Amino acid sequence: AKRALRLCSIHQKTCILQHFGKAAIRLHIPRFQCSLPYLETHSSLLYYMTTLGVSVHTVEEAVKAEQLGATYLMASHVFPTACKPSDPPIGVDTVKAICKAVKIPVYALGGVTPKTISQLQDVPIKGVALMSGLMTCPDVPGYLKELRA
């Protein structure tokens, strides 16, 4: 975490730590991302975090996360992804329903590629989160340009 924080500081980027809440508190990082079950068992995080993202997969989870104090949601995984080949994607309609059900920003994650991103065009998401595609592409600027096209 310290290394990631240094890199973010050098490049003037925001760092949001994930899953290790005690580390975020110890390092005085008030931005954290976790699963709903983690938040349910670590509700004291709310006292330390100014930004609290929660991963959700259903409308019910989204509503509960918002009630528990989430400041944004990560709806996943929207499309099929190599990271979770045996788990069915939640789909675009579920992401739309999540956006309608909550007042906080929702980001789409999972299987978002240049081929799938257009399916999110009319969904009221705040943005998308990229993982595998970005980490495995040989040309990051080109990949990002293709996503924005």
Question: Residues of each region from the PLM?
Answer:
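Alpha/beta enzyme core
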Residues: 22, 27, 37, 59-76, ...
